[in-house]
From Swiss-Prot:
GO MF entries: 2 iron, 2 sulfur cluster binding; metal ion binding; oxidoreductase activity
Binding site for [2Fe-2S] cluster: 37, 42, 45, 75
Keyword Plastid in record: no
Enzyme class: oxidoreductase
Domain 2Fe-2S ferredoxin-type: 2-93
Documented EC number(s): 1.17.1.-
One Pfam family it belongs to: FAD_binding_6
Gene3D superfamilies, sorted: 3.10.20.30, Nucleotide-binding domain of ferredoxin-NADP reductase (FNR) module (3.40.50.80), Translation factors (2.40.30.10)
Protein name as it appears in the record: CDP-6-deoxy-L-threo-D-glycero-4-hexulose-3-dehydrase reductase
Species: Yersinia pseudotuberculosis serotype I (strain IP32953)
Keywords: 2Fe-2S, Electron transport, Iron, Iron-sulfur, Metal-binding, NAD, Oxidoreductase, Transport
Function according to Swiss-Prot or TrEMBL: Participates in the conversion of CDP-6-deoxy-D-glycero-L-threo-4-hexulose to 3,6-dideoxy-D-glycero-D-glycero-4-hexulose together with CDP-6-deoxy-D-glycero-L-threo-4-hexulose-3-dehydrase (E1) in two consecutive steps. The detailed mechanism of E3 is not yet resolved.
Domain FAD-binding FR-type: 98-197
Amino acid sequence: MSLNVKLHPSGIIFTSDGTSTILDAALDSNIHIEYSCKDGTCGSCKAILISGEVDSAENTFLTEEDVAKGAILTCCSKAKSDIELDVNYYPELSHIQKKTYPCKLDSIEFVGEDIAILSLRLPPTAKIQYLAGQYIDLIINGQRRSYSIANAPGGNGNIELHVRKVVNGVFSNIIFNELKLQQLLRIEGPQGTFFVREDNLPIVFLAGGTGFAPVKSMVEALINKNDQRQVHIYWGMPAGHNFYSDIANEWAIKHPNIHYVPVVSGDDSTWTGATGFVHQAVLEDIPDLSLFNVYACGSLAMITAARNDFINHGLAENKFFSDAFVPSK
């Protein structure tokens, strides 16, 4: 069975056999539509069903209002007939192929209380292509976890990852207690549609915890291109000592178009900077977001709160781009 899937407004058409999800069918056809977690948790792959029938698995993201508007999640919906969808298509990703690469642990640096910065070296013949902001799956002993790439494309070709230690986490135990330098690992990627869009709007980057990793990659890429858009970086942490890098402050000192505000959400008597929820700090400085693009990476709760509050302060819904951390299943 071959079913046609037509995307609007691009007019792109691909086929599905009805047994794979709409998202997987699209990616198998090298058609890149919005997605992130691929398991129905983050909601990035939300699309509007214009016509046709789909079989959708249960998910916790779509509201009754979403369903009434015809919204589906392409990562957990399968086509039952020819269908038409209102969903973004990204030709910028058409030249990028997801592959599995061998790599070695070139270095590991433990910073702060619970963060490890990994540098992975690929073979000289393995040239991974990605857009700043995308993520990879790190594969160790048959297990995998998704991590955002923390450095811009180019450089020495290494892949930088920022990993937070999770209490009783199997993968965390491997990374923090068992990994050895030069150990052979594998990565699969790149994945995701989290990258900087090419327009002239000023940018707000919103990061929670190690959500700073893709922000670092995207800002580095903007600097490398000498992009002069106004960039506002807000990075939230529970306490002042949790900030594990000073590079954002260095950017702000060196580049007049880059502005940086670290925000502490917890009780820290030594902290003299911005406090509270990191997205609320944005609204205190920029109460009207109607002329901005926002890129947010962090917990699902942070992403959801930021999206709702930012839209209420003028941000166009299609100008909010996010990559939410979701728990491993």
